[in-house]
Amino acid sequence: MKRTKGYKIILLSGLLLLCPGCSEDLPADAEIAEVALFPDYEEVTVPANIAPLNFKLPNEQMRGITRLKTIHKDIRIPSRSGVFNIPMDEWKEAAEDAKGDKIDVSVYFKDSSNAWKLKRFPIFVSEDSMDNYLTYRRIFPGYRMWGEMGIYQRTVDNFVENPVINNRRTGNSCVNCHSFCRQDGSKMLFHQRSNYGGTYLVDGSDVDKISVTDQGKAFGLAYPYWHPSGKYIAFSHNDTRQDFHYSDRNRIEVYDKSSDIVIYHVEEHRAFTVPLLSSPASYETFPAFTPDGKSLIFCSADSVNMPDEYRKVRYHLLRIAFDPEKGTFGQQVDTLYNARKEGRSISFPRVSPDGKRLLYAVSDYGNFSIWHR
């Protein structure tokens, strides 16, 4: 028995020597230098309840030590593989200590010269926390491997991930465009393509499938946005195509041959639109209600001969008044960004919950900016 206890003590001592966050001597003669870290967290601002911001050096053969310093915490993480995994408990304590301030990060590393180098930067920590769940669609990268996909949620203060819906249960059909009403996890929608095709509205334990028709013919809905009241949902209806270039650096081209915006009345189970949102002379898409519910922001481009003139398509950012009591729109459209004048194209507009900030993507042309370098 004594022998066994001795082995346990020796093993425990060895583990303590490798323990991240334990005292680690820092190189005294490190020279200031740049290094590309992934992900790049330099000077970012994060919510106080975010999970550890683990990162790595560009070469897994690089040795390094990372120091995280706040007023009351001093964490040191050694690595022989270029990967820095920050202990959960120590990160939480450091983030709590740095609320409204910053964590000073010092990354010591050895490059090809085998000399110690040093990169310093701050990570700012907000006094505020964010919603506890992040929801996203997970699919293989590329443009063909869509047979396995799902909508997942991850707890932001750790790395626990759970499926909301996985397409293994639906015959490997496409699921996409999930959207929540005012970040309410119990009230959401998502689209299902092919098998069991349609748009599904989830309200607590109730699930309804909706199908919008035009002159008796069902058509698919795409980009959604809830009205803050929960009574309406704005959708785009897109005839989307995908082509491939032989020599262009943007190898894949995704474009709309037509698109309009329709509004679905949740309580009355009906869809409606107006000419300013569904003109055959324009491509209307990416609707987004403002937080007060009194305006709809959307993108619109002049229709052209597609796909031949795809590079001529540039989307304006527009706004139209909306009366949620009557369910009616205004008679004119305001231009927030004139694509014809600016020479760029707008997509995916979003208004901050307080209504003070507007976020959107800008690209040289088109509306599928993720493929445009």
Where do the PLM segments sit?
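Short, conserved, GDST-rich strand-edge loop motifs in beta-rich repeat architectures
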Residues: 132-145, 235-257, 298-315, 361-373
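Multi-bladed beta-propeller domains
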Residues: 30-40, 73-90, 157-173, 203-220, ...
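C-terminal motif of bacterial Sec signal peptides marking the signal peptidase cleavage site
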Residues: 18-21
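Hydrophobic beta-strand positions that form the internal "hydrophobic ladder"
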Residues: 187-188, 230-233, 293-296, 358
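Low-complexity, Pro/Ser/Thr- and charge-rich linker/hinge segments at domain boundaries
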Residues: 37-38, 115-144, 217
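Conserved beta-strand position repeated across blades of beta-propeller domains
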Residues: 179-181, 225, 288, 350
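Contiguous beta-strand segments within globular domains
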Residues: 39-60
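Residue-level detector of Asp-centered blade-edge/turn motifs that repeat once per structural unit
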Residues: 182-184, 228-229, 291-292, 353-354
